[in-house]
C-alpha cells in the first residue's frame, strides 16, 4: 500500500515497502561467512520496478543500529519518513521506496544503539556522489553500451608476462587544464579524446590512474578514498568515466587503477565509526589508526570487511572493464609495527610483527581477481624486502603479478643526482639491482613519489647546465629501458617538466615549444617504439635468460654494457651507457656474434637535442675477443648517452 501526503506530493511513497529485498538466504550466508564478493549488486541503492512502479531499493550494513532511515530531497531530509527494515541478524537494513530514482541525492541516518548517537552517513556502496565538498550519495544506474570487445578478448594476451608494458602514470585533475576557464580540470569525456591521442602518439601500452575513487580532500590525490564503488564526480558522471576507459580500450591501451585498501579517511560522513562502533576499522588504535596519515585502517580479520574490499575490486573489473590494479601502501598492511614505535603495536598470535589478517586478505584478493577476471593484473607498491610478493599464493606468495622496484628508483635517482665526477665512486648503485632483479616480477617506476614534497622534478634533479640536464634525463630513460622489468613514468617527466608536480595546476605543455623539451619527448616516443617492437627488450623482463652483463665493472669510465635477449634467445640487443659528460672514443665491448651491428637508438642524436655524435649508423664486429666473447665492437660513446645496437645481415 502507498500512502502519500497530498500537500507535498512528489510522486514518492511515504511508506517503505519492507517486503522488497535483493537478498536471498544464500546472500546472507555468504555475507556472514566472508565469501560474498558481488555485494555491489545487493547493497547500496538500486533502481528497480515493483508492481509497475519504479523506485529504489536501499541496502546498508549497520549491525549496531537501532534505526536506519534514508533521507534526501525526496523527503525533505526528514529521517522519520523512510525507515529501513533489518534483515534477520545479518546487520543489513533494507527497503524499497517507490518514486525515488536516478540523480536524487541521499544519505543514511543511523541511530546507534550506543550512546544514542545520530549519524548521517554517505552510502558505502554508492555508485555516484555529489561533487565535493558536498557529501551526499547520488542514486545512479550503471548501464553503458561498451564497444571494447576486441580489447577484452585479447587482454590476456596483451598483459601476459612476455608482453611489453610501458605505463604512463596520470593524475586526471592536473594532466591538462583549461587555463582560460578558471584553470578547470578536463572532464572524463575531454580526457577520452586528448589523453588517448597523446598515449597513442607516445607509444605507451597502459595508463595508470592515480585513485579515481571518490575522495573528499582533493589534496590527498585520491589516496584517502571513501567512494570504493564510485569514480569521483569532479570530472563527470559514471558513464563518462566508462567512456574514457572504452575509448582507451578501443585504441589498444590498457587501464590500471590505483586502489587503496590500506586505509581510509576519518571524515564524518564516511565509513569510520559507521554505526556508532568501529565497524570498518579495527577498534584498537594500535591496529586501526595510521599515525602518519591520521586515517583509519581496515579490520582485515572481519568477514564483512573482506566482502567489502574484494567486492570493490571486482566491481571495477566488472562494471568499468579496468584491466588491473596497482595496490597502494602494501607494506603498511603487511607489518603490524609499520611506522610505530615499541609499545605502539600489537604482536600477532605467534609474537611476530606480520599482520596475518592483512596477508590473508591480500592473498584472497589476488586469488579472486585472477579467478573471476583472467588476464587482469595486480601490482604491489611494496617498499620492503617481503619475499614472494609477485609469486602465486599456492607457492606461498602474496599472489600479485608484479611489484614496484622502489629500491631501483631510489638508487638510480641518487646516482643520477651526483656530479659525474663523483659517479665512479657510486657505480654499485647502477649494478646492485641485478643481484635481486629476478626474485620478483618488477616494474621500474619513475613515479609521482619522486617529484613532490620538495624533491624537485626529474629534470631539476639532474646535475650540470641545461644541456647536460637534458642529456642526463635522456640517459636516465635509456638506462631504465635497457634494464629488465616493465616501465612506468609519471606524467610530465617524458618532456622534462621543470616544476615539481602540483595537483591543482596543469603540466606545462608550453615547454614543448622548446627544442630541448621536444627532443626529450621525441626520445621517449622512440624508446617506447623500440621497447614494444623489439622482442629482446620485453619478452624476458622477468627471466635471467633475457639479460647478460657485458661489463658492469667499468667504474673508472662510469660506463655499463649489457645484452638483452628474447624468450628464445634468437634476438639480441646490446645497450651501452656512458654516464660521464666526456665522449669515449675507441671504446671496445664484447659482441656475442660476428655481424654488422646497427645503431638503433642514440640518445645523443641531434633530433633529441644531443650533440650528434655516434657510430655512423652501424659498425662491424671485429674478430677480436673481448669480455669473454669471440668478437667485439669498437664504439664511439657520446657524452651522457645511451646507445642501443642490433645485429643485422645487411648494414644498409
What feature does the model see in each segment?
Residues 1-57, 87-169, 174-183, 190, ...:
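The feature marks proteins involved in alpha-glucan
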Residues 516-537:
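Catalytic cores of secreted or luminal carbohydrate-active enzymes
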Residues 132, 321-323, 338-504, 532-604, ...:
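Conserved alpha/beta catalytic core and glycan-binding cleft of carbohydrate-active enzymes
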Residues 102-106, 616-652:
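C-terminal beta-strand-rich structural cap/linker in extracellular carbohydrate-active enzymes
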Residues 80-88:
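Short, surface-exposed loop motifs enriched in S/T, G, D/E and P with embedded aromatic residues
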Residues 130, 149-162, 171-354, 619:
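Substrate-binding/active-site clefts of carbohydrate-active enzymes
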Residues 61-68, 592-594:
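Short proline/glycine-enriched turn/loop motifs at strand-loop junctions of beta-rich domains
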Residues 60, 108, 170, 199, ...:
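Conserved, mostly hydrophobic/aromatic
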Amino acid at each position: 500500500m502507498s500512502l502519500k501526503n497530498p500537500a507535498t506530493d512528489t510522486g514518492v511513497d511515504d511508506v517503505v515497502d519492507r517486503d522488497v529485498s535483493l537478498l536471498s538466504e544464500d546472500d546472507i550466508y555468504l555475507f556472514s561467512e566472508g565469501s560474498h564478493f558481488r555485494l555491489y549488486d545487493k547493497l547500496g541503492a538500486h533502481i528497480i520496478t515493483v508492481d509497475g512502479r519504479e523506485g529504489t531499493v536501499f541496502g546498508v550494513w549497520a549491525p549496531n543500529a537501532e534505526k536506519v532511515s534514508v533521507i534526501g530531497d525526496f523527503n525533505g531530509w526528514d529521517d522519520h519518513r523512510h525507515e529501513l527494515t533489518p534483515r534477520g541478524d545479518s546487520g543489513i537494513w533494507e527497503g524499497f521506496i517507490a518514486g525515488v530514482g536516478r540523480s536524487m541525492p541521499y544519505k543514511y541516518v543511523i541511530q546507534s544503539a550506543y550512546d544514542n548517537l545520530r549519524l548521517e552517513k554517505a552510502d558505502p556502496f554508492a555508485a555516484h556522489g555529489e561533487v565535493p565538498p558536498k557529501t551526499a550519495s547520488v542514486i545512479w544506474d550503471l548501464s553503458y553500451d561498451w564497444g571494447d570487445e576486441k580489447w577484452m578478448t585479447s587482454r590476456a594476451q596483451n598483459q601476459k608476462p612476455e608482453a611489453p608494458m610501458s605505463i604512463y602514470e596520470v593524475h586526471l585533475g592536473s594532466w591538462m587544464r583549461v587555463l582560460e576557464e578558471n584553470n578547470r580540470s578536463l572532464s572524463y569525456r575531454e580526457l577520452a579524446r586528448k589523453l588517448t591521442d597523446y598515449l597513442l602518439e607516445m607509444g605507451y601500452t597502459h595508463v595508470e590512474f592515480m585513485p579515481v575513487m571518490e575522495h573528499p580532500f582533493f589534496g590527498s590525490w585520491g589516496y584517502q578514498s571513501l567512494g570504493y564503488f564510485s569514480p569521483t564526480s569532479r570530472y563527470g558522471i559514471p558513464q563518462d568515466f566508462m567512456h574514457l576507459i572504452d575509448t582507451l580500450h578501443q585504441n589498444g591501451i590498457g587501464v590500471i587503477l590505483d586502489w587503496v585498501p590500506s586505509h581510509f579517511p576519518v571524515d564524518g560522513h564516511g565509513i569510520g565509526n559507521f554505526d556508532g562502533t568501529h565497524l570498518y576499522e579495527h577498534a584498537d588504535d594500535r591496529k586501526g589508526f595510521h599515525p602518519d596519515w591520521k586515517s583509519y585502517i581496515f579490520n582485515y580479520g572481519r568477514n564483512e570487511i573482506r566482502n567489502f574490499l574484494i567486492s570493490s575490486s571486482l566491481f571495477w573489473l566488472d562494471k568499468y572493464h579496468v584491466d588491473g590494479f596497482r595496490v597502494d601502501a602494501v607494506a603498511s598492511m603487511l607489518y603490524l609495527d609499520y611506522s610505530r614505535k615499541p609499545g605502539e603495536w600489537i604482536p600477532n598470535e605467534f609474537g611476530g610483527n606480520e599482520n596475518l589478517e592483512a596477508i590473508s586478505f591480500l592473498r584472497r584478493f589476488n586469488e579472486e581477481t585472477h579467478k573471476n577476471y583472467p588476464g587482469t593484473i595486480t601490482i604491489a607498491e611494496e617498499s620492503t624486502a617481503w619475499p614472494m610478493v609477485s609469486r602465486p599464493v599456492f607457492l606461498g606468495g602474496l599472489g600479485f603479478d608484479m611489484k614496484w622496484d622502489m629500491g631501483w628508483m631510489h638508487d638510480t635517482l641518487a646516482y643520477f643526482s651526483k656530479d659525474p665526477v663523483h659517479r665512479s665512486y657510486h657505480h654499485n648503485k647502477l649494478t646492485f639491482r641485478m643481484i635481486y632483479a629476478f626474485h620478483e616480477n618488477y616494474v621500474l617506476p619513475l613515479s609521482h613519489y619522486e617529484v613532490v614534497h620538495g624533491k624537485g622534478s626529474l629534470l631539476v634533479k639532474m646535475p650540470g647546465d641545461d644541456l647536460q640536464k637534458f642529456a642526463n634525463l635522456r640517459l636516465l630513460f635509456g638506462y631504465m629501458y635497457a634494464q629488465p622489468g616493465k616501465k612506468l613514468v609519471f606524467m610530465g617527466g617524458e618532456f622534462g617538466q621543470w616544476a615539481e608536480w602540483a595537483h591543482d595546476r596543469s603540466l606545462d605543455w608550453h615547454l614543448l615549444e622548446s627544442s630541448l623539451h621536444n627532443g626529450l619527448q621525441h626520445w621517449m616516443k622512440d624508446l617506447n617504439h623500440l621497447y614494444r617492437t623489439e622482442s629482446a627488450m620485453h619478452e624476458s623482463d622477468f627471466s635471467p635468460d633475457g639479460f647478460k652483463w657485458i661489463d658492469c665493472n667499468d667504474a673508472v669510465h662510469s660506463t655499463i654494457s649489457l645484452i638483452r635477449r628474447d624468450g628464445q634467445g634468437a634476438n639480441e640487443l646490446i645497450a651501452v651507457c656512458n654516464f660521464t659528460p666526456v665522449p669515449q672514443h675507441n671504446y671496445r665491448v664484447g659482441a656475442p656474434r660476428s655481424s654488422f651491428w646497427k645503431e638503433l637508438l642514440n640518445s645523443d642524436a641531434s633530433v633529441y637535442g644531443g650533440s650528434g655524435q655516434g657510430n655512423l649508423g652501424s659498425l662491424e664486429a671485429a674478430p677480436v675477443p673481448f669480455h669473454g666473447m669471440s668478437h667485439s665492437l669498437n664504439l664511439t660513446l657520446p657524452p651522457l648517452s645511451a646507445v642501443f645496437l642490433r645485429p643485422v645481415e645487411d648494414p644498409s
